[in-house]
Curated annotation (Swiss-Prot):
Mitochondrial matrix side: 1-78, 123-212
Record topological domains on the Mitochondrial intermembrane side: 100-101
The keyword Transmembrane belongs to this UniProt entry's keyword annotation: yes
Name of this protein: Transmembrane protein 186
Originating organism: Bos taurus
Superkingdom of origin organism: Eukaryota
Lineage: Eukaryota, Metazoa, Chordata, Craniata, Vertebrata
Length: 212
């Protein structure tokens, strides 16, 4: 037992055990601490795109919020109307509702669906706000979604057809914003909307009689 204790006392400590590895790393010209918890560097730079550019507001239609609330109300009303059809069918099968009332409920539900489709088609193309980037090359259109919420669409200014080439007149209730590519058409009203930056607006859509 005494011999074993003397052998343990003479053996190198834990600090000496790591010296060969330390010498190996140092001979390689590398710091061993670099390998502890290190990993490949991650780039924090975001890719450049329209979302990262600065835009200037050039047009605003203040009533777009009211149209958004109206769109949500119409979706809720249509959902309730359609949800009332299954109970109506059950009542008719049990003889609790005449056939004429069932037809009336079905007609109301069909009319509500048709109105929702028409209103959604128009509201999703109604322009609430127009922005132009500082270089004047990108047009950002803020409009509504099917659910009455805001959505931004980016269009190259070079693809936008000037309103001076459109058959629509500024005195009309709505004017169309069209693209040469034919991707999407929007509607804006100069009668009830406000042009906030006339210079940038005319750079995109041309000089209109209503803005002179």
């Amino acid at each position: 037992m005494a011999a074993v204790l003397r052998a343990v006392a003479r053996s190198p400590g834990p600090a000496a055990w790591g010296r060969p590895l330390h010498r190996l790393c140092c001979c390689g010209g590398q710091d061993p601490r670099r390998w502890v918890g290190s990993g490949p560097p991650h780039s924090k730079e975001k890719p450049l795109g329209p979302e990262t550019e600065k835009f200037q507001m050039v047009y605003r239609f203040d009533a777009i919020k009211a149209f958004g609330y109206l769109s949500r109300l119409k979706v809720a009303q249509t959902a309730l109307t359609v949800a009332a059809l299954p109970p109506g069918l059950y009542c008719y099968s049990q003889g609790l509702m005449p056939f004429s009332s069932l037809c009336l409920a079905g007609g109301v539900a069909g009319f509500a669906l048709a109105m929702l489709c028409w209103m959604s088609h128009f509201f999703r193309r109604l322009v609430g706000i127009l922005y132009v980037n500082e270089e004047g090359t990108v047009l950002r259109v803020a409009h509504l979604t099917f659910w009455g919420r805001r959505q931004d669409t980016y269009c190259p200014v070079a693809d936008v057809i000037p309103m001076t080439e459109s058959p629509d007149r500024p005195q009309e209730l709505f004017m169309r914003i069209q693209q040469y590519s034919g991707k999407q058409t929007f509607y804006l009203t100069l009668r009830y909307g406000r042009v906030l930056d006339q210079e940038r607006f005319t750079q995109v859509f041309g000089v209109l009689d209503a803005l002179k």
